[in-house]
Regions:
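Conserved alpha/beta-domain cores
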Residues: 1-197
Length: 197
């Protein structure tokens, strides 16, 4: 059996053309890059609950659209959806680059109002820096700390699948929880998933 890595419907369609039978890994973190990076940053960095909830709503919308397209392309075939896996810093601005940008703005005479938006952001990102991010806040641990993220992702998977079933499509999603090390991580994430499904 040939399963492929595919993170968008175009890759899934190409895989089918080459004879793939299923998607063995859909890396959802790739769906949060580009212009969507700002949305997940708003969720992670904000202390304002309303901003966090709006970011989650925006993420739910784009994730649902992504999964609708993926599952439709792969109708009748398995799609293994991995919940967010990479270290937290991959979703954030590089703190040293942000520090340089602030210094340049200060030197150029930027207004205090403009700088006031950047300084707290830098402090927040600096507070999240890890000495070894590959072993730190990533995979299931990211899901434990930010439990709304896997909840949103599972809701997007379930919503897309339910909608397509009503349209006569045969979605077959499977959910992978990354980097589980201890039973408690599995139990907590499973409880989150079961609240949706």
């Amino acid at each position: 059996h040939v399963r492929v890595n595919a993170d968008n419907p175009e890759d899934a369609a190409l895989a089918l053309e080459f004879g793939a039978e299923a998607i063995g890994l859909c890396r959802t973190e790739h769906m949060f890059l580009g212009d969507r990076k700002n949305i997940i940053q708003s969720f992670i960095l904000s202390d304002d609950e309303a901003v966090k909830q709006q970011a989650l709503a925006d993420l739910l919308k784009v994730q649902t659209e992504d999964f609708l397209a993926m599952f439709k392309t792969m109708s009748g075939r398995d799609v293994v959806v991995r919940l967010l896996d990479p270290p937290l810093h991959e979703f954030l601005d590089d703190p040293r680059e942000l520090e340089v940008a602030i210094t340049k703005k200060e030197a150029a005479g930027a207004s205090e109002e403009e700088l006031a938006a950047l300084r707290p952001r830098l402090r927040r990102i600096d507070s999240m820096v890890e000495s070894n991010p590959m072993l730190g806040l990533r995979g299931v641990r990211l899901s434990v700390v930010f439990s709304d993220l896997p909840l949103m992702q599972v809701r997007a998977v379930a919503t897309a699948a339910a909608r397509l079933i009503k349209e006569g499509v045969d979605p077959r999603p499977e959910i992978m929880v990354p980097l589980v090390s201890i039973t408690a991580e599995h139990v907590q994430t499973r409880e989150v998933i079961e609240r949706v499904i």
